[in-house]
């Protein structure tokens, strides 16, 4: 019998689940809106209902066909005990997600930080395959980070290692959900780029952004890049400012860890080469090891939006 696992990518905007095999192949997947805020128990039921419907719609039975369920969650995650100690974007603390979900599923459930799950996927089968030192930075609702250092996942004390979204890159800057000001994710997340794009649209009714997206509520990172590529000055300024902040945070990480590879994931990474072409010159200028023979490579995560699903499933594989 083929071994199959469910991987769940628990995001602030969407919950995505997929059925995955040992090699990281996704057989099927499905997603629903997270619709925060809500009580923990309600979100747990949403996760279960999503996985149950995914299996039923594709001819699988959770009890008989699935080995385990892996959850990739933002925040400080104790993978050994299956507890999310803190998740500022969800507003949860001491969330005993493993224990609670196992009661619903009736099979083993494992939980890991979502960015750690994503770097596991990239190291095992993605664009960091074969690396002993690699990072992933996910640009979504917030900014997440995962590190594979000297051949193993780095969790840190209190399971709060690589919360890169909460390094400060702008003193006394924008207020973050964590309580600090000027955090990386307030400037470099997909949400930040969306917010800045919408602000620019309000300030510049003449911008091409309006022609590409007449409904400002639907404006997002893609719209900003599309307008920039068409020569719109307003969009170009928005994107260039975003890139400067993103490069600032990435160079800080590169100078601390000197990884072989930094993988970029999350919604903004869908811009692929356009994103890399803007980033690389700034990083080349600021990287402390810019004169070294071997340089850190900035790449788009192979699995991109699927990295969370595959990585979460691989957490289950590692515990099988």
What residues fall within each predicted segment?
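A charged helix-plus-loop insertion that forms the helical arch/lid used to bind
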Residues: 82-93
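Catalytic-core segment of enzymes that process non-peptidic bonds
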Residues: 148-149, 153-154
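Structural signature of FAD isoalloxazine-binding scaffolds in flavoprotein oxidoreductases
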Residues: 160-163
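ATP-binding/phosphotransfer module of carbohydrate and carboxylate kinases, centering on a glycine-rich
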Residues: 1-68, 78-81, 99-107, 121-131, ...
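Conserved A3 ("GATE") glycine/threonine-rich loop of ANL adenylate-forming enzymes
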Residues: 14, 117, 141-144, 171
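Short beta-strand segments
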Residues: 9, 68-74, 136-142, 146-148
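General beta-strand structural signal in soluble alpha/beta enzymes
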Residues: 109-113
């Amino acid at each position: 019998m083929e071994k199959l696992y469910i991987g769940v990518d628990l995001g602030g905007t969407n919950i995505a689940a997929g059925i995955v095999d040992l090699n990281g192949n996704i057989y099927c997947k499905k997603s629903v809106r997270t619709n925060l805020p809500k009580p923990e128990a309600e979100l747990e039921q949403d996760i279960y209902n999503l996985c149950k419907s995914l299996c039923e719609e594709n001819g699988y039975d959770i009890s008989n066909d699935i080995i385990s369920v892996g959850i990739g969650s933002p925040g400080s995650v104790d993978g050994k005990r299956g507890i999310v100690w803190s998740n500022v974007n969800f507003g949860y603390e001491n969330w005993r997600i493993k224990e609670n979900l196992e009661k619903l599923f009736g099979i083993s459930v494992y939980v890991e930080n979502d960015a750690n799950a994503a770097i596991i996927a990239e190291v095992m089968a993605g664009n960091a395959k074969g690396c002993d030192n690699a990072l992933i930075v996910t640009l979504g609702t917030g900014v997440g980070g995962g590190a594979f250092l000297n051949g193993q996942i780095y969790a840190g004390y209190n399971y709060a290692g690589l919360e890169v979204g909460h390094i400060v890159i702008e003193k006394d800057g924008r207020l973050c959900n964590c309580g600090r000001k000027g955090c990386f994710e307030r400037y470099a997340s997909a949400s930040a780029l969306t917010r800045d794009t919408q602000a620019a649209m309000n300030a510049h009714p003449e911008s091409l952004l309006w022609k590409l997206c007449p409904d400002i509520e639907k404006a997002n990172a893609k719209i900003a890049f599309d307008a920039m590529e068409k020569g719109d000055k307003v969009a170009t300024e928005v994107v260039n400012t975003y890139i400067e902040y993103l490069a600032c945070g990435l160079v800080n990480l590169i100078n601390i860890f000197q990884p072989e590879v930094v993988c970029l994931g999350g919604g903004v990474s869908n811009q692929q080469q356009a994103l890399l072409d803007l980033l690389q010159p700034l990083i080349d200028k600021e990287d402390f090891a810019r004169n070294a023979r071997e340089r850190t490579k900035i790449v788009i995560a192979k699995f991109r939006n699927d990295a969370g699903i595959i990585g979460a499933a691989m957490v289950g594989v590692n515990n099988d």
